């Protein structure tokens, strides 16, 4: 019996509407963008709702999806307006939000049913038990921590059916907040 391998989704960052269009035209299956709220890159040229909607419509012509990074760490008072923001994303056709903070995950799940929630790499998921935890809370995909090795990724894949995303190119973070990864690199 021959096992058919699933083709991985090619997911590209898109910092502007022009970059979104180029990524999709050149074969990206999906793009991730930042909105004007709830993202870590608050100083970047993030998308307005109108630009997001235009991007969603453009991507749909190519069979591609648009995800929005909502990966900020919530501080007291940041939650105001989040429910409405997630509902609007869902209503304009955003395929999923990429979230790391449990408060934002809870708000997105309760306020915007039907909007897929992916766990951001910022949440530092490094083992299958963590993936199972987030699955129980309704997340459909987990972006593994960038520090996960290929061997660890393979083992995680064997032990869970949660959809996995992994960075394969680009910037590498070398530390977690409060965790020293330099000593871990000495082990390998």
Q: Which residues are covered by each model-predicted region?
A:
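Conserved small/polar residues in nucleotide/adenosyl-binding loops
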Residues: 187-188
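N-terminal basic/disordered segments at the start of proteins
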Residues: 6-32, 36
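Conserved, mostly hydrophobic/aromatic
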Residues: 23, 101, 134, 166
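Hydrophobic faces of well-ordered beta-strands that scaffold small-molecule active sites
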Residues: 9-14, 31-33, 66-70, 97-99, ...
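N-terminal active-site wall of soluble small-molecule enzyme domains
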Residues: 58, 64-133
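Active-site-adjacent beta->alpha loops and helix N-cap segments on the catalytic face
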Residues: 41-53, 78, 100-112, 147-161
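Glycine-rich, proline-tolerant flexible connector loops at the mouths of alpha/beta enzymes
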Residues: 32-51, 69-81
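Active-site-proximal loop/turn and secondary-structure-junction residues that shape catalytic pockets
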Residues: 14-18, 37, 70-76, 102-104, ...
